[in-house]
Amino acid sequence: MAEKQRGPNRLAKVSLDEASIARGNPDQEHERAIALFDILEDNSFTIPGREGPYALTLGLVENKLSFAIATVDGEPVMTHLLSLTPFRRVIRDYEMICESYYNAIRTASPSQIEAIDMGRRGLHNEASETLKQRLEGKVDLDHDTARRLFTLIFALHWKG
C-alpha cells in the first residue's frame, strides 16, 4: 500500500486488493510501483458532498471493477462497482501494445519505439476518458489521476 497526506480532495492512500492481483513480471511490478507512487504524489479525487482525503482500494469483484473508498482513518465512504465491459477492448489492446513496447526497447530504433509509445499513450488517454465518464457524478477526478488509475486497473489484469 502506498500512503501520503496532503489537501482534502485527494487520495491519501491507494492499494490494490491482494485477492484481485497476480504477481506480474519485473517490468509489470515496476510499473505498478511507479503508478502507486505517482498517484499519491499528484492527484485530484473528490466525492461530491463529501470532503476527503480518501483511501482507495481497487479490486475485482464478480468481474466488476471495485472502487472501495474510505476515509484515511478507515471509515467506509462508498463502494462503487463498474462494469469492465467498456474497458475490455482497450485493456486487451493496451496489453498488446505494452508487450510490443517492451520488446521494441530491446531491439527497435528510437523512432520505432517512439511510434509505439505514441500509440500506447493514445490508448491510455482513451481509457482514462472512459473511466472519467463512468465515474461522472460519483467521483470527480482530473485527467492525470484518471490515467494513473487506469494504470492500476490494468495492473489488476496482469497474468502472473
Curated annotation (Swiss-Prot):
InterPro entries: UCP032146 (IPR008321). It comes from the Bacteria. It holds the Pfam family UPF0262. Belongs to the UPF0262 family. This is UPF0262 protein Mrad2831_3513. It comes from Methylobacterium radiotolerans (strain ATCC 27329 / DSM 1819 / JCM 2831 / NBRC 15690 / NCIMB 10815 / 0-1).
